[in-house]
Amino acid sequence: MSSIIVIGGGAVGLSVAYHLGKRCARDVVLLERHQLTSGTSWHAAGIVGPLRATPNMTQLAMYASDCFKTLETETGLSTGYKRTGGYWLARKADRMDELQRIV
């Protein structure tokens, strides 16, 4: 019997189970009806770009990107994640503010 059950093996469910296990709970069970990350998370194509509409979402995306490296170090397994870089253009001042937030 577990004290915590996480339902859904997508990006969010896996993250919740991982962080609960690291922080406080050693008996976390994750339930997924199909294959891990086979639902909505699969359709996201693994894109974790830092540019988001709010500062909090930008911070979360940057944390997620860093987490892939941590997972490889902790597990010794490759996540397959690659930082590829990119270009962003700003035609308006508010867009420039968003870009400066991630620099």
Positions of PLM-derived features:
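Short coil/turn connectors at secondary-structure junctions
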Residues: 1-2, 25-26, 84
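Beta1/beta-strand and adjacent pyrophosphate-binding region of the FAD-binding site
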Residues: 1-12, 29
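N-terminal transmembrane alpha-helices
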Residues: 6-7, 19, 35, 51
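Glycine-rich nucleotide phosphate-binding loop and flanking beta-alpha elements
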Residues: 13, 37, 95
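Glycine-rich FAD pyrophosphate-binding loop
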Residues: 21-42
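Dinucleotide-binding Rossmann-like beta1-alpha1 core, especially the glycine-rich loop
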Residues: 46-103
